[in-house]
Amino acid sequence: MRPLHPIDFIFLSLEKRQQPMHVGGLFLFQIPDNAPDTFIQDLVNDIRISKSIPVPPFNNKLNGLFWDEDEEFDLDHHFRHIALPHPGRIRELLIYISQEHSTLLDRAKPLWTCNIIEGIEGNRFAMYFKIHHAMVDGVAGMRLIEKSLSHDVTEKSIVPPWCVEGKRAKRLREPKTGKIKKIMSGIKSQLQATPTVIQELSQTVFKDIGRNPDHVSSFQAPCSILNQRVSSSRRFAAQSFDLDRFRNIAKSLNVTINDVVLAVCSGALRAYLMSHNSLPSKPLIAMVPASIRNDDSDVSNRITMILANLATHKDDPLQRLEIIRRSVQNSKQRFKRMTSDQILNYSAVVYGPAGLNIISGMMPKRQAFNLVISNVPGPREPLYWNGAKLDALYPASIVLDGQALNITMTSYLDKLEVGLIACRNALPRMQNLLTHLEEEIQLFEGVIAKQEDIKTAN
């Protein structure tokens, strides 16, 4: 038995029927050409009869303010096998994921489920993994899944994700003396971080407000249809994009790939809101999580936030891109002057009011930001599960009261995998955002082509 971490407690406290606090991932696999007709059934049976033992946190359940080992762990509660009705189109798959992502996890059991889904067109099957954010963040979740798969197409009998022993499982068995030493060291580092945080607040934030046109702070986000109270119903949409297209745009315009990603999202959001006559006159503000991990730990929440000006009030895509670049660069320069502990303390002070707003359920006229846009680094080499190649992986995140849309992306091989999750009742035809993303990429490619034509003509 171990006490809840404060961050674990926050994620658990935020949860209510219309606001589930789990994250998920949809993994699409290609069945090998020479596989028997019983390939998926054999895979499921191997998992069910596996003698591998679940490791923390997958064998932990809630017990008041503590995590306790589930001594009656029942794999059938967590692991399920279903089939889509014929013809098993991606549309039906996404509808099923939307429904599954809308339901709460059972707090009487360890807070995760895994579904194997067969019958998908193109001789494919899928795995949908859902786990509470109190257990894992996005970066940690990606690392966990990567560890549970193989880089070798010939490797068989791979251990299920919930049996892969990571650093947290080992850390939970650490002697008490070692834990106490780490706690004291953490307190010391927090105290040492305080002077630098105060200096940054006085020299950077307060000077930027009102002077730097690209600076954005909490509660500057305009009112929009993205910022409504949410219901329990979700809509999930996903699509893969060629990562080289983003690289080429970034190289041609001398910006980072992340700048281009944010600019493409900005243009798509602008087009979506305009189609619903709901574009605010002031720019949307995105909260962009940034990992500050300095090790290879596979769990815990080690993230800070950047508030990015999306410049959706500008019609010119190049102007939007430049404003986004400067806005993100301002935050990055600030964080470069701080250690990870100083960044966490700084973020707590600057973004604390926004967190209090979410926890309390209050809905002020102005939100801290309009939506979350997250880009999680993923595996660069092909992954396999008992010889089945992982074709695509799509993240599914969280929406909250006042934050009815979340855009989460991850890279895999040469692709950018985009997962959109939204409140179905708040945002009509949300899947059209995927079309607008493609249109915005083409818009930037057209701008670059014109620039090259001008250079050639001269």
From Swiss-Prot:
<keyword id="KW-0319">Glycerol metabolism</keyword>
<feature type="active site" description="Proton acceptor">
    <location>
        <position position="133"/>
    </location>
</feature>
<dbReference type="InterPro" id="IPR004255">
    <property type="entry name" value="O-acyltransferase_WSD1_N"/>
</dbReference>
<comment type="function">
    <text>Bifunctional wax ester synthase/diacylglycerol acyltransferase (WS and DGAT). Catalyzes the terminal and only committed step in triacylglycerol synthesis by using diacylglycerol and fatty acyl CoA as substrates. Required for storage lipid synthesis. WS uses C(12)-CoA to C(18)-CoA substrates whereas DGAT prefers C(20)-CoA. Upon expression in E.coli and Pseudomonas citronellolis (DSM 50332) both WS and DGAT activities increase.</text>
</comment>
<dbReference type="Pfam" id="PF06974">
    <property type="entry name" value="WS_DGAT_C"/>
</dbReference>
<protein>
    <recommendedName>
        <fullName>O-acyltransferase WSD</fullName>
        <ecNumber>2.3.1.20</ecNumber>
        <ecNumber>2.3.1.75</ecNumber>
    </recommendedName>
</protein>
<keyword id="KW-0444">Lipid biosynthesis</keyword>
<keyword id="KW-0012">Acyltransferase</keyword>
<dbReference type="GO" id="GO:0047196">
    <property type="term" value="F:long-chain-alcohol O-fatty-acyltransferase activity"/>
</dbReference>
<dbReference type="GO" id="GO:0004144">
    <property type="term" value="F:diacylglycerol O-acyltransferase activity"/>
</dbReference>
<dbReference type="InterPro" id="IPR014292">
    <property type="entry name" value="Acyl_transf_WS/DGAT"/>
</dbReference>
<keyword id="KW-0443">Lipid metabolism</keyword>
<comment type="similarity">
    <text>Belongs to the long-chain O-acyltransferase family.</text>
</comment>
<keyword id="KW-0808">Transferase</keyword>
<dbReference type="GO" id="GO:0019432">
    <property type="term" value="P:triglyceride biosynthetic process"/>
</dbReference>
<dbReference type="GO" id="GO:0051701">
    <property type="term" value="P:biological process involved in interaction with host"/>
</dbReference>
<dbReference type="GO" id="GO:0005886">
    <property type="term" value="C:plasma membrane"/>
</dbReference>
<dbReference type="Pfam" id="PF03007">
    <property type="entry name" value="WS_DGAT_cat"/>
</dbReference>
<dbReference type="GO" id="GO:0006071">
    <property type="term" value="P:glycerol metabolic process"/>
</dbReference>
<comment type="pathway">
    <text>Glycerolipid metabolism; triacylglycerol biosynthesis.</text>
</comment>
<dbReference type="InterPro" id="IPR009721">
    <property type="entry name" value="O-acyltransferase_WSD1_C"/>
</dbReference>
<dbReference type="InterPro" id="IPR045034">
    <property type="entry name" value="O-acyltransferase_WSD1-like"/>
</dbReference>
<dbReference type="GO" id="GO:0071731">
    <property type="term" value="P:response to nitric oxide"/>
</dbReference>
<dbReference type="GO" id="GO:0001666">
    <property type="term" value="P:response to hypoxia"/>
</dbReference>
